[in-house]
Amino acid sequence: MFITMCVIAYNEENAIDRILGDIAAQDYNHNDMEVVLVDGASTDNTKKHLDNFKEKYKDDFRRVVVLDNPKRTLPSGWNVALREYKGDAIIKVDAHAEIPKDFVSKNVRVLESGEDICGGQRPVIIDEETPWKNTLLLAESSMFGSSIAHTGTIREKHM
C-alpha cells in the first residue's frame, strides 16, 4: 500500500525535527511512502527544517514535497495537502508529536484488514506549561485530535 505521511506546520522550529526524525525512522518500506510537508508561512526557521528534510531524504522516500500554505490556518494547510497527496491512504501526524517506528506499518496492517479509518496513540509534546497549551494538549489527546489514517473516497467528497 502506498502511504502518504502529512505534516502541517506553523512556527514549529523547536519541535519539527522530532517528528521528521520519527518519519525517517519508520520501519515501513520508504519506497511505498511519500511525505507531504506543508508550511503555514512560518516566521521562524520551520520552512528551512522542512526543506532540509526534503533534501536529505528525497532519494529515500518515493516522494518528498514541501508546500506553502499562505492562509496559515490548519484547515487551509490540510486542503493544500489533500490536493497534493498521491497515496492510497493518508496518515496525519502533528508537527509537535512523536510516533513509534512501527506507526505506519501498524496502521497499514489495520487498513489492509478492511478498516477505512484507523489511528494510533502518540504523545504530543508541549514546549512550556501554559493554560492554553495544556488545553490544546487535552484536545489533541482525544480521539478526534489524534493521528489518523484514512483510505477511501476522500478525494471525491472533499475536494
Residue ranges of model-derived segments:
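Short beta-strand/loop segment that forms part of the nucleotide-sugar
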Residues: D32-A41, V65-D68
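Glycine-rich, basic loop-to-helix element that forms the pyrophosphate-binding segment
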Residues: N69-Y85, K106
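Conserved donor NDP-sugar-binding/catalytic core segment of glycosyltransferases
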Residues: K101-N134
